[in-house]
Amino acid sequence: MKALKVAATRRAMKDIHPGEHLAEELKEMGMSAAEFSRQISVPTNRVTQILKGRRSITGDTALRLAHFFGTSAEFWLNLQSLYEIRLAEQKSGRAITALPTIKTYQPAHV
């Protein structure tokens, strides 16, 4: 499982949705999305949407994944956060870096 954490964290840096990490784990175990969803007691649609990158990892799902894989909920939520940050950087990064910072802020004189 430590290999899962290391490999997943490295891949997260490359704009990979956490569902891809989950898909890889399920493939290695030979487990279908339907069987996995039964194991963690969630609707199959939730798992398939995560696997397709169409649904985010929520707190509830992170707890279930952590329990099943012997990781932490924070691990799964961090993968989701890293993914979302990478997407935001791609979409708005340049505009955000052009904004003032506390060091460059000049109060308006009234």
For each of these PLM feature ranges, what is it?
Residues R54-H67:
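Short, basic-rich loop-to-helix N-cap that marks the start of a DNA-contacting helix
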Residues M31-Q49:
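Short alpha-helical DNA-recognition segment
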Residues P43, R54, F69, Q80-Y83:
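The DNA-recognition helices of helix-turn-helix-type DNA-binding domains
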Residues M1-T9, T104-V110:
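Intrinsically disordered, low-complexity and often Lys/Arg-enriched segments
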Residues K5-M31:
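A short, Lys/Arg-rich alpha-helix, primarily the initiator
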Residues L26, S37, A66:
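The alpha-helix within a helix-turn-helix
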Residues H67, L77-V110:
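Short, charged recognition helix plus adjacent turn
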